[in-house]
Swiss-Prot record:
Protein name: Regulatory protein Cgi121
Effect caused by changing L134E: Severely affects Bud32 binding and does not stimulate Bud32 kinase activity
Species for this entry: Methanocaldococcus jannaschii (strain ATCC 43067 / DSM 2661 / JAL-1 / JCM 10045 / NBRC 100440) (Methanococcus jannaschii)
Top-level taxonomic group: Archaea
Pfam families assigned: CGI-121 (PF08617)
Organism ancestry: Archaea, Methanobacteriati, Methanobacteriota, Methanomada group, Methanococci
Length: 145
């Protein structure tokens, strides 16, 4: 599985109609690569919420059960993105279409990003923000549809 950060991507919704196996997340609310890996693991091992594995990653990463809410929270937008692909060939094809600069640092947390993540994921109080996001993902199993 390939997980890369891309700075300054331009998202054209046509890429989602190409039949390729990938997902793009808004990197501005990704709490490190660990967040993405946890979402992938949950997508592989838990009862599916979405119809496709790739959409399941988005749903799990958002900490939501509703696909439309997941897209609002962590769906692809122009700017910094996290591109998740099965293989190099798919990565190259999508990267050619969205452009930008490969930069995994967009997946790391800084003060402003932590503030945004705490707000979006409704994380109150202190504690490691990455661990709290992982908890939110795990708690999806307990939420009612």
């Amino acid at each position: 599985m390939i997980i890369r950060g891309i700075r300054g991507a331009r998202i054209n919704n046509e890429i989602f109609n190409l039949g390729l196996k990938f997902q793009i997340l808004n990197a501005d609310v990704v709490a490190t690569k660990k967040h993405v890996l946890h979402a992938i693991n949950q997508a592989k091992t838990k009862k599916p919420i979405a119809k496709s594995f790739w959409m399941e990653i988005l749903v799990r990463a958002s900490g939501q059960r509703q696909i439309h809410e997941a897209i609002k929270i962590i769906g692809a937008k122009d700017g910094n993105v996290c591109l998740i692909c099965e293989d190099e060939e798919t990565f190259r094809k999508i990267y050619e279409l969205i452009g930008g600069e490969i930069d995994d640092s967009v997946l790391e947390i800084n003060e402003d990003k932590e503030r945004l993540i705490r707000e979006i994921f409704k994380i109150r109080g202190f504690g490691n923000v990455v661990e709290r996001v992982l908890e939110k993902i795990a708690l999806i199993e307990l939420k009612k549809e």
